[in-house]
Amino acid sequence: MEAENSEVAALVEKFTGFHAAISKLPSLSPSPQVDALFTELVAACVPSSPVDVTKLGPEAQEMRQDLIRLCSTAEGLLEAHYSDMLTALDSPLDHLGRLPYFDNYINLSKLENDLLAGHMAAPARVAFIGSGPLPFSSLFLATYHLPDTRFDNYDRCSVANGRAMKVGAADVRSRMPFHTAEVADLTSELGAYDVVFLAALVGMTSEEKANTIAHLGKHMADGAVLVARSAHGARAFLYPVVELDDIGRGGFQVLAVHHPAGDEVFNSFIVAQKVKI
């Protein structure tokens, strides 16, 4: 136990250092300095760790919450940068390998599809909430795994949607409409979907995440499936954690939980089914 506590303390100290360094950056837009620092940060999260971020002290929790906010901002700027770069090219899909973490998106979409396939037939309609300016997740699922499925993509930022709708082949884009909306404003629409994906950065705090899941549970159809991206171990310094208790309180039954090992996939995810009350 003492060794574990020492390991956690060392980890908190390391991420406190990252937080301090990132906070001093003049900009979080992609640059050699920003890219190098975030690459180092991501690498520090990959090894297995005993840390449970819910048990951190107030000061460490405050640091972690602000680090998640900084990472969210940087990720949005990174995706916007590469979305603009891709759509300026004649054949954007031929250049996807240029993007950082490209393999992560490929592997994550395959894992999520494989787990879904174990619990349901191919869905007719899917919603992706928090699709962002570079909608790789829905793009890869629509292209490689679910060729007959319609993907409705929701993001609260109209500029992000404007970028996103230019990415992808025309035949896939016809099945991938984009809508500008806050998740809290989606009600009857949610009842039309067989599957709802919840992006990792929709709901930045534990309370926001719990409220979002409760809202989805209130409006999704009975039997529909929620795929909620989360984080585990040291990766929870970069992304919010989805609590299984909040999944249950939202009216869902957990079907599967996946925590990745190694660096092939970064996010954890939870597959849960809306139960009839």
Where are these regions (language model features)?
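Conserved Class I S-adenosyl-L-methionine-dependent methyltransferase catalytic core
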Residues: 39-121
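S-adenosyl-L-methionine
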Residues: 163-192
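Conserved SAM-binding motif I beta-strand of class I
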Residues: 150-155
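A short SAM/SAH-binding and catalytic strip from SAM-dependent methyltransferases
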Residues: 183-184, 192-209
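A short glycine-rich, Lys/Arg-flanked "PGG" loop and its adjoining helix->strand segment in the class I
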Residues: 210-225
